[in-house]
């Protein structure tokens, strides 16, 4: 059996978007695979039928974007296939092309096209749709122009790319570029007429929450004096009447989600952020006579926070029906499905360890989910009466002739709090030998490590490293009190990480204490920066997409103007000392650890200036350091970056540790 190689991720199949047909007899799912030749990903649709438990491919071109069911026998999806339309887009025009494919056979045919950026489609019937459109108020309607007028407008647009003018905050977004003046709008679209009818438009930014019985439920975010508001409102649009109704005003609630349930009820997931700040877990309410009535008062960690570098794409995390809702939550270090009846009875379904990445319910009453089980890559599973069944084998071949390591799990205690930790032993582990080790720290901080596969960790274990990781305080899955470390970054979280390191070194004497490295991304990068300024116990560090200075991060990051103030409980004008005390840059003069910095030039979440500052400070103080910048990548480099860039990133980190932990 050969060892898992760094480049083996090119063979992985990533699954997402599980969606059942209107009659619940069959489901769509998307697969994505690395396209090394074009340095991208090929995305295709597959059909799953519960009756025979089989999947079959529906597309092969690898260009599928958004997709949905048109009816029980036809699907629609976005793709760019017409060469003439591609040329228009290349010249600067904005178009979306939607294709229709019959399940009975035949080629996909263009169903309609629009001179807009369509980011979401909800089907009302074969002719009418609810579209979510990305609109730029600063851009003229070039697509409606002709002749010289269009040519001049395109030429001006090209020339204007040399400049960027902003008058809003945030003015850019990670993975989106500059967002100034851009809004997400909701429109009705009639295919035969080719006309759009606005539901919610500029200056508001709106997203569809649910559509049912001729009504659109949607969430609206506003800008006040050029600043994006942190609270939002909930609206209901009656398609037949063409009327909007405000259901929840914008002055109190941060609304995370909403939908229809039961026969005629509306639920809202929301929080006022009063007690635990912006990361406070939402409560779920029923909206009755204009009042928010608690439906379930449990402290729920909504969705899956179980991290991995082996996913691409999302999917449904909540399912609603006449009996209530089912939804994904993070429980300690696993994500599982819950049910909630209209009477308010919540049940956490007993499931295997791992992650539920998205799910839907079939007509047979069975729950189907895409998830990770048994330290392996994603597959499709069914769940009924407490029993899970694996239904697909997209990634089985990956494990046929390569070695992977199942981590040891254990708990430890710090400050009276029980915490979770894992250790991967090196492949071909010999208890009589000494090995180097790598400590990997998760991002967030409100996420978790769990019993799921991480490609980078498996690579290192196959190269002869111990790899260890834990969930310190500040993470998800254990309620608001556990997650709330506002104003105390680098305190109990750092204490937990150092205690875990002590425990690991004691439990595994085969680890060479002089050859231990530390790495992490985002919050994990922040903690890496923090650690090297507070201890010399690590022989090397790799800080990825990090934060080094809360003062600069606060007013450069796309979320900084509210995230920094909330998380470090200060601003430069209210308590500069507290902000600086929690900034790793303050302690850069104490660093002795050779450190690699990994950063993307389009990372607007933890901007590249954060990496520049820490790198420059270490160089100034004579510490061995290296900065590798990735052009055209953003905060998602390790999980969704271009394949060749993902390979180079892991090469850089691995080579750094090889240099300092082995040589």
Which residues fall in each region the model found?
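Multi-bladed beta-propeller domains
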Residues: 1-15, 47-65, 89-94, 101-118, ...
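Beta-strand-rich domains and repeat architectures in extracellular enzymes and scaffolds
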Residues: 7-43, 207-209
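Non-catalytic accessory segments flanking enzyme active sites
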Residues: 16-19, 159-167, 172-185, 207-208, ...
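Blade-terminus and WD-like Trp-Asp/Gly-His loop motifs, strongest in beta-propeller folds
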Residues: 19-26, 66-74, 121-127, 209-215, ...
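A flexible loop/linker signature enriched in serine peptidases of the S9 family
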Residues: 31-44, 59-65, 79-97, 114-117, ...
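Glycine-rich His-Gly loop
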Residues: 32, 221, 440-444, 600
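Cap/lid segment of the alpha/beta-hydrolase catalytic domain
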Residues: 394-514, 521
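Active-site-proximal cap/loop segments of hydrolase catalytic domains
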Residues: 472-663
């Amino acid at each position: 059996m050969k060892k898992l190689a760094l480049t083996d991720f090119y063979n992985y199949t990533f699954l997402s978007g599980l969606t059942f047909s209107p009659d619940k007899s069959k489901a769509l799912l998307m697969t994505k695979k690395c396209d090394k030749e074009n340095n991208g990903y090929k995305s295709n649709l597959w059909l799953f039928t519960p009756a025979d438990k089989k999947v079959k491919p529906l597309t092969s071109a690898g260009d599928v974007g958004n997709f949905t069911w048109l009816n029980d026998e036809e699907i629609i999806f976005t793709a760019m296939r017409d060469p003439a339309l591609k040329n228009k887009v290349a010249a600067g025009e904005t178009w979306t092309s939607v294709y229709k494919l019959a399940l009975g056979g035949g080629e996909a045919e263009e169903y309609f096209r629009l001179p807009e950026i369509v980011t979401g489609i909800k089907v009302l019937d074969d002719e009418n749709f609810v579209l979510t459109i990305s609109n730029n108020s600063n851009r003229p309607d070039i697509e409606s122009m002709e002749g010289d007028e269009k040519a001049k407008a395109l030429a001006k647009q090209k020339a204007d790319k040399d400049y960027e003018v902003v008058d809003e905050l945030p003015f850019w977004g990670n993975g989106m570029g500059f967002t100034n003046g851009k809004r997400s709008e909701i429109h009705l679209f009639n295919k035969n007429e080719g006309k759009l009818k606005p539901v919610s438009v500029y200056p508001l930014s709106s997203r569809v929450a649910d559509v049912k019985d001729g009504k659109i439920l949607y969430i609206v975010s506003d800008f006040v004096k050029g600043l994006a508001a942190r609270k939002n409102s909930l609206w209901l649009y009656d398609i037949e009447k063409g009327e909007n109704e405000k259901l929840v005003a914008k002055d109190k609630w941060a609304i995370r989600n909403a939908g229809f349930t039961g026969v005629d009820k509306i639920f809202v997931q929301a929080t006022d952020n009063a007690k635990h700040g912006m990361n406070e877990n939402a409560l779920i309410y029923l909206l009755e006579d204009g009042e928010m009535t608690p439906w379930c008062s449990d402290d729920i960690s909504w969705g899956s926070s179980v991290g991995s570098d082996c996913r691409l794409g999302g999917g449904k995390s909540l399912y609603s029906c006449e009996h209530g809702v089912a939804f994904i939550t993070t429980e300690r270090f696993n994500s599982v499905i819950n049910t909630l009846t209209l009477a308010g009875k919540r049940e956490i379904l007993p499931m295997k360890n791992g992650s539920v990445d998205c799910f839907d319910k079939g007509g047979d009453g069975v729950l189907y989910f895409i998830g990770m089980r048994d330290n392996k890559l994603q597959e499709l599973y069914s769940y009924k009466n407490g029993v899970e069944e694996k239904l697909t084998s997209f990634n089985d071949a990956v494990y046929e002739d390569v070695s992977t390591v199942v981590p040891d799990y254990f708990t430890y205690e710090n400050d009276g709090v029980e915490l979770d930790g894992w250790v991967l032993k090196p492949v071909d582990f010999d208890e009589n030998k000494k090995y180097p080790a790598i400590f990997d720290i998760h991002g967030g901080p409100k996420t978790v490590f769990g019993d799921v596969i991480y490609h980078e960790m498996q690579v290192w274990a196959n190269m002869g490293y111990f790899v260890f990781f834990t969930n310190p305080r500040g993470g998800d899955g254990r309620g608001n009190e556990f997650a709330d470390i506002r104003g105390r970054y680098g305190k109990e979280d750092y204490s937990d990480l150092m205690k875990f390191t002590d425990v690991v070194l004691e439990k595994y004497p085969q680890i060479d204490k002089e050859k231990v490295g530390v790495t992490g991304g985002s919050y994990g990068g922040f903690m890496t920066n923090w650690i090297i300024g507070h201890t010399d116990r690590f022989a090397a560090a790799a800080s990825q997409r990090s934060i080094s200075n809360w003062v600069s991060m606060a007013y450069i990051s796309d979320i900084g103007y509210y995230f920094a103030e909330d998380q470090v409980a200060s601003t430069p004008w209210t308590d500069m000392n507290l902000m600086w005390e929690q900034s790793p840059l303050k302690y850069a003069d104490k660093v002795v650890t050779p450190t690699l910095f990994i950063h993307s030039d389009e990372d607007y979440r933890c901007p590249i200036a954060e990496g520049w500052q820490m790198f420059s400070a270490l160089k100034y103080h004579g510490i061995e350091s290296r900065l590798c910048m990735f052009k055209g990548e953003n905060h998602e480099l390790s999980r969704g970056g271009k394949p060749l860039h993902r390979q180079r990133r892991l090469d850089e980190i691995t080579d750094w540790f090889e240099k300092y932990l082995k040589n």
